[in-house]
């Protein structure tokens, strides 16, 4: 299974690898990968050195027979290949395709790794040919064992998948059988139910058939006797009852119409004794009626002046209300501008504006540099994007000041409002 040491070997987390034991460093996951294989695969030389120094096996392979040398050579990690060769890893090891690390590097066109492995193989053949022969025999023996183990794992996996598939199929069939079996107890009482149901259906059919038969006989009689008279359609009793009911309904409707009283529109629940202001000027007829009602006469000029003053007061009140509403608003309608389409400034734009360096924004946008990338840039990086000396110094000075402020933010104090 995969452990934290596998992840540490992949990410080159050295502090955690220094705490690992020999068992932890040689533990395989579901693909047969050990921390040694992962470090060689990713080209993490420092992690590979720590793992091998703490007991990691440099000749351990995965389920496909790939050793750390195979991974390092095929991925072009020449520094890892050199370390493994010097550490004593078997350069003649074979994978399940019977390929050596030299063959794997050649298939990937890793020329530097091919040169290192060829030089090491030549040196070992010259120095100790017997050891080379023994290493090749051991590699072939290990390759045969690895191939058998891989075939066994594949067969086991296929059997497991077939068993899972058959189990799912049997589960589906058993569930359908269970559905049928659960419906069988209800079928046990079916004879009585079906008997009563069939009896009811038969009775219904008999009634329907009898009714249809009577209707057919009646129609036949009418057809033989000819067309019926109009007086035969309604009976006398029905006519009397119909006329009596109709007369009663007419009397009730007349009484209801007489009792209906249309109330005023102002007589509504909840309004109480609210006084509604009259917004119109009195007409001459109303004025003349009021003269006759109160029994005194007013000069027509006075009434005209009074009506004009009331109209002026009403217009002034309306204008005052409108002006009051406008004065209560905390903003000016003419100056309000909707900013729905305004895009927020990026952190890079804010940083450059705060340092008065906004003229360099197009250069950084052209190179797709954001604020995080800018903080990682050095003088050589800025020079590589063809920035002049003066702008480079300004940008680097602003970056240094930002880093100093972030490192020493200062103490937070309360301020008086």
UniProtKB/Swiss-Prot annotation:
Residues 310-322 have a biased composition (Acidic residues). As part of the intermicrovillar adhesion complex/IMAC plays a role in epithelial brush border differentiation, controlling microvilli organization and length. Plays a role in assembly of the complex. May play a role in cellular response to endoplasmic reticulum stress. Changing residue 417 to R: Decreased interaction with USH1C. Residues 171-190 have a biased composition (Polar residues). Residues 151-195, 305-330 are annotated as: Disordered. Keywords: ANK repeat, Cell projection, Coiled coil, Differentiation, Phosphoprotein, Repeat. Residues 1-252 are annotated as: Mediates localization to microvilli. It comes from the Eukaryota. This is Ankyrin repeat and SAM domain-containing protein 4B. Residues 130-164 form a coiled coil. ANK repeats lie at residues 31-60, 64-93, 97-126. GO terms for biological process: brush border assembly; cell differentiation; protein localization to microvillus; protein-containing complex assembly; response to endoplasmic reticulum stress. Its main location: other. A motif (PDZ-binding) lies at residues 415-417. InterPro entries: ANKS4B_SAM (IPR037601), Ankyrin_rpt (IPR002110), Ankyrin_rpt-contain_sf (IPR036770), SAM (IPR001660), SAM/pointed_sf (IPR013761). It is found in: Cell projection, Microvillus. GO terms for cellular component: brush border; endoplasmic reticulum membrane; microvillus; plasma membrane. PANTHER family: ANK_REP_REGION DOMAIN-CONTAINING PROTEIN-RELATED (PTHR24161), ANKYRIN REPEAT AND SAM DOMAIN-CONTAINING PROTEIN 4B (PTHR24161:SF20). It comes from Homo sapiens. The modification Phosphoserine is found at residue 283.
């Amino acid at each position: 299974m995969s452990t934290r040491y596998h992840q540490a070997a992949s990410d080159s987390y050295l502090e955690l690898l220094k705490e690992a034991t020999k068992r932890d460093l040689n533990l395989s996951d579901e693909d047969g990968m050990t921390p040694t294989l992962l470090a060689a695969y990713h080209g993490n030389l420092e992690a590979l050195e720590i793992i091998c120094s703490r007991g990691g096996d440099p000749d351990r392979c995965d389920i496909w027979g790939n050793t750390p040398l195979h991974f390092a050579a095929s991925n072009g990690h020449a520094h890892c290949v050199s370390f493994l060769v010097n550490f004593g890893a078997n350069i003649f090891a074979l994978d399940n395709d019977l390929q050596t690390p030299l063959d794997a590097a050649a298939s990937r066109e890793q020329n530097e790794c091919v040169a290192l492995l060829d030089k090491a193989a030549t040196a070992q053949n010259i120095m100790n040919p017997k050891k080379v022969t023994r290493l090749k025999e051991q590699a072939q023996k290990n390759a045969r064992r690895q191939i058998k183990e891989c075939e066994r794992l594949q067969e086991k996996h296929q059997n497991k998948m077939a068993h899972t598939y058959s189990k799912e199929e049997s589960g589906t069939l058993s569930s359908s059988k269970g559905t049928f079996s659960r419906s069988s107890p209800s079928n046990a009482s079916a004879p009585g139910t079906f008997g009563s149901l069939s009896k009811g259906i038969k009775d219904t059919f008999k009634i329907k058939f009898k009714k249809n038969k009577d209707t057919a006989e009646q129609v036949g009689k009418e057809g033989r006797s000819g067309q019926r008279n109009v007086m035969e359609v309604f009976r006398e009793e029905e006519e009397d009852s119909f006329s009596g009911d109709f007369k009663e309904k007419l009397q009730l409707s007349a009484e209801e119409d007489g009792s209906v009283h249309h109330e005023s529109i102002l007589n509504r629940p909840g309004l109480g004794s609210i006084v509604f202001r009259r917004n119109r000027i009195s007409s001459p007829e109303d004025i003349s009626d009021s003269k006759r009602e109160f029994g005194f006469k007013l000069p027509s000029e006075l009434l005209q002046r009074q009506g004009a003053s009331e109209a002026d007061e009403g217009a002034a009140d309306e204008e005052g209300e409108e002006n009051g509403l406008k004065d209560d608003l905390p903003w000016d309608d003419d100056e309000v501008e909707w900013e729905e389409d305004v895009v927020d400034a990026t952190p890079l734009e804010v940083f450059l504006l705060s340092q008065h360096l906004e003229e360099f924004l197009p250069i950084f946008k052209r190179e797709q540099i954001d604020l995080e990338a800018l903080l990682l840039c050095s003088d050589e990086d800025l020079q590589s994007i063809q920035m002049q000396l003066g702008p480079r110094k300004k940008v680097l000075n602003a970056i240094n000041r930002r880093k100093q402020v972030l490192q020493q933010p200062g103490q937070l104090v309360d301020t008086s409002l």
